[in-house]
Curated annotation (Swiss-Prot):
Active site per database record: C514
Name the UniProt record assigns to this protein: Ubiquitin-like modifier-activating enzyme ATG7
Superkingdom classification of source: Eukaryota
The organism's taxonomic lineage, starting at the top: Eukaryota, Fungi, Dikarya, Ascomycota, Saccharomycotina
Gene of this entry: ATG7
Signal peptide location: none
Free-text domain note: The GxGxxG motif is important for the function, possibly through binding with ATP.
Any Pfam family the entry gives: ThiF
Length: 664
């Protein structure tokens, strides 16, 4: 046995894990791996020995976003002058599991795999001898990554019989000329040629010479610990007890070692867990929260909660289609504020508000996007609601594209007073509709919802309507026109009316001017409105999704429903009643004489645009005449007259005095 001073020692390998590695791991964990904690193939990178410089004083394995591969590396290869090292990662689901797993048993299992591969191999295949393992846990809420890298190494002890710091110049030149084209790390030197085929010790009486292309330029003259597995192979499989190893370095600091085997344990022993910077055995922690841009962290956090839905409860959920929606909110009051917050929760990043009002002192307690300062800002007038709501959304989530527009929506029953101004505001509204995919109607009055209803049908937008009573609420979606769906076209907010909307805002008392409603109703209606939108988007027919749910209704509509939303039902109307804490669903077909969505109204709007709108606003009877409601009213009056005549109390005999008393 040699003394400790002559025992061959090594420079340990260190890992360098770039932040992009963890960013990619986080994405894969959320979107691909999910709850799968099985081993996944990865690869690492080392600078080619011929490309080392003075800063490469320790052997380093680098991991980055390119480390994630679909399958195991098939052969020794290089990329951008870097050796590609084969490895794997086991990413556990909980920190408790990460702490509890037996690291020694895990290392032993890796050592067993390495031993079997080495003993079955007849060449120094780099990817086998220099594999690595990563055990990790990803805390995606805090962006902390716990990891421990292992370089499984089979043990054998060697004594240094001779060290020579001067290599024969001819041999040095031979090695220099070949390393530029080699992808491996360990070779047998035969007549100046580097060979991966290794002779057994029984086939030669000479002390063989091997070349180890070192992965560091350590001044301590200690070779990289990557040499260990090659030495174990030579001792265990090839039977060598005495060898020469040229530790090649490209800085003319190569040296030759003559080694004698001290011990090759049987059974084999394995080591390999990386030590911390303090020299202790233990995992490392990468806290990306300290390195990342807070805005980017917020964006990732929003995606986190949503993508977790796909792990177990809703694996088929299409999050991209929700995130891509451009949403227009008409009304930035109580409903508008809550709808906007719910949309943010679903990852919607393009939201526009339209409202002509300003924040008053009664608003902040019921409308969560406003605060006390908004009430007296802008020279005491209060902030415009639309812009204040948009700014508040950006403070909540900087990644949202939120904009506010302070315009009035032209209202049926309210004649034009300033054509230039109102025409300009209509033009802005028209542009906003064209730029949007979804429109929420969240205004205070019925007549304010008429024009957006017409525009939504004419432009084929998804329109969601939410309205409040004192202790009730209504949430509904408007039907769209399609040649394939005409028979089942759903109605709109005005399809139950037999008169066109009128001015309901003039001559009202204070309790009629303010929205008097139980505060919780707005939250319920807003959340239902957003969830209804999500269900529609998850349906293959989108806005044409069928609202029929039971078999009787299906037969009634003569259609067998086979398509469903991934989130279940897509009802037409949801009516809630807080006095009984009940909720009912209804579906109502389009009314052919509807003042907002009938075909005649839609056609006139498409043809004439603003001119049509002006006619409807200035001429109270024009709209009813156009859609046929006037005729319906006339027919109703005629039918009522006929009914009265049929119920006449006049008979052939004289009228009873009791009858006269009742009539009078």
């Amino acid at each position: 046995m040699g003394s400790d001073l002559n025992t061959l020692r090594f420079t340990p390998i260190q890992s360098f894990v770039d932040s992009s590695f963890f960013a990619k791991l986080a994405r894969l964990k959320l979107e691909k791996f999910k709850l799968d904690s099985s081993t996944q193939y990865i690869c690492g990178f080392q600078t080619r020995p011929s490309k080392l410089n003075k800063f490469d004083d320790i052997p380093t394995l680098a991991l980055d976003e390119q480390s994630f591969v679909e399958e195991e590396i098939g052969k020794d290869s290089i990329a951008n002058d870097r050796l590609i090292t084969s490895g794997s990662i086991t990413n556990l689901n909980t920190i408790e599991e990460f702490k509890a797993i037996s690291k020694q048993d895990l290392l032993h299992s890796w050592g067993e795999d390495l031993y079997q591969q080495i003993m079955a191999n007849d060449t120094f295949e780099y990817k086998i001898f220099q594999s690595f393992k990563v055990l990790s846990y990803s805390d995606l809420k805090k962006y902390k990554f716990y990891y421990w890298v292992s370089f499984p190494t089979l043990q054998s002890s060697w004594t240094i019989l001779e060290r020579n710091d001067v290599i024969n110049s001819g041999i040095q030149q031979d090695i220099d000329s070949q390393t530029k084209y080699l992808n491996g790390q360990f070779y047998q030197l035969r007549e100046g040629r580097l060979d991966t085929q290794i002779e057994d010790s029984s086939n030669t009486e000479l002390v063989p010479t091997f070349v180890f292309l070192d992965s560091c330029l350590s001044q301590s003259k200690r070779p990289s610990a990557q040499l260990k597995n090659y030495l174990f192979y030579l001792a265990k499989k090839k039977g060598y007890s005495e060898i020469k190893v040229i530790v090649y370095r490209n800085n003319a600091a190569s040296f030759l070692l003559k080694l004698k085997l001290q011990e090759c344990p049987d059974p084999w022993k394995v080591v390999g867990w990386e030590r911390t910077s303090q020299g202790k055995l233990g995992p490392k922690l990468a806290d990306l929260g300290l390195l990342s841009d807070p805005t980017q962290l917020a964006s990732q956090a929003v995606d986190l909660n949503l993508k977790l839905m796909k792990w177990r409860v809703a694996p088929e959920l299409d999050l991209d289609i929700i995130k891509q929606q451009k949403v227009l909110l008409l009304g930035a009051g109580t409903l508008g504020c809550y709808v906007a917050r719910a949309l943010l929760g679903w990852g919607v990043c393009n939201i526009k508000f339209v409202d002509s009002g300003r924040v008053s002192y009664s608003n902040p307690v019921r409308q969560p996007l406003f605060n006390f300062e908004d009430c007296f800002s802008d020279n005491g007038r209060g902030m415009p609601k639309a812009s204040a709501a948009a700014n508040a959304l950006k403070k909540i989530f900087p990644g949202v594209n939120a904009q506010g527009y302070e315009i009035e929506v032209p209202m049926i029953g309210h004649p034009i007073t300033d054509e230039q101004k109102q025409g300009s505001q209509y033009g802005v509204l028209d542009d906003l509709f064209n730029q949007s995919d979804v429109v929420f109607l969240l205004m205070d009055s019925r007549e304010a919802r008429w024009l957006p209803t017409v525009m939504g049908v004419a432009k084929g937008k998804i329109v969601i309507n939410a309205a409040l009573g004192f202790d009730s609420y209504l949430v509904m979606r408007h039907g769209n026109i399609s040649s394939l769906k005409d028979k089942l076209r759903l109605g709109c907010y005005f399809c139950n009316d037999i008169v066109a909307p009128e001015d309901s805002l003039s001559d009202r008392t204070l309790d009629q001017m303010c929205t008097v409603t139980r505060p919780g109703a707005a939250l319920m209606a807003s959340s239902l409105a957003v969830e209804l939108l999500v269900s529609i988007l998850q349906h293959p027919d989108k806005s044409f999704a069928n609202a029929v749910e039971n078999n009787d209704d299906r037969k009634k509509h003569e259609e067998k429903v086979e398509k469903f939303s991934k989130f279940g039902a897509c009802p037409h109307q949801i009516r809630g009643f807080l006095n009984t804490f009940s909720q009912n669903k209804f579906h109502i077909p389009n009314y052919e004489h509807c003042s907002a969505c009938s075909q005649k109204v839609v056609d006139q709007y498409i043809q004439n645009g603003w001119e049509f709108v002006k006619d409807c606003l200035n001429n109270q009877g024009y709209l009813e005449e156009l859609c046929g409601l006037s005729k319906v009213q006339e027919e109703a009056e005629l039918a009522a007259q006929q009914l009265l005549e049929e119920l006449s109390f006049e008979e052939k005999g004289e009228i009873d005095s009791e009858d006269l008393d009742w009539i009078n």
